[in-house]
Amino acid sequence: MDIETLKERKKGLGGSDIAAIFGLSKWMTPYQLYIDKTTDEIAEEDIDNDQIYWGNLLEPVILQVYTKKTGRLAKKPDPMIWSKEHNFLFANLDAITNCGRIVEVKTSRISSEWGEEGSDDIPQEYILQIQHYMLVTGMQVTDIAVLITGSDFRLYEVHADKELQSIIIDKAKQFWQMVLDRT
């Protein structure tokens, strides 16, 4: 991710931030997220690490496979989409289809975290991320295209959950107020 995008991300909460707020992120604790949002510092690992490298390299390939398997054309949208209702929430989507679905691309080394293909049985942190994206965009369905262990391609489908989105809004508001108040 480029430096300007990382600076822009400090102005609000994105999908991966939501899992951290709930304490479900593998990558960041709520405290680390708070420090990230309240300082101007950009961590080196946010700019480049193996996961970012491989994710960026494989994303277009996974999207091509997604299009081939579903028949849905997936295109990269604007880098950051800000919520019209909650001005501190944004989404950085991997793709949007020609039929109004979000497509989230993942790579994973652990197949046991993923349920039956076609279901919504995916890791909790990704459920939060995806519900956040649907909350920000107003879209109702997200397809998850995941490449597991380098050769196992699977598709999952998650529908908007208004109850969970309401919980996300409440926790995000509380967290963002702490960021604004520096408390």
Q: What residues fall within each predicted segment?
A:
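Charged, glycine-rich intrinsically disordered N-terminal tails and low-complexity linkers that flank
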Residues: M1-V61
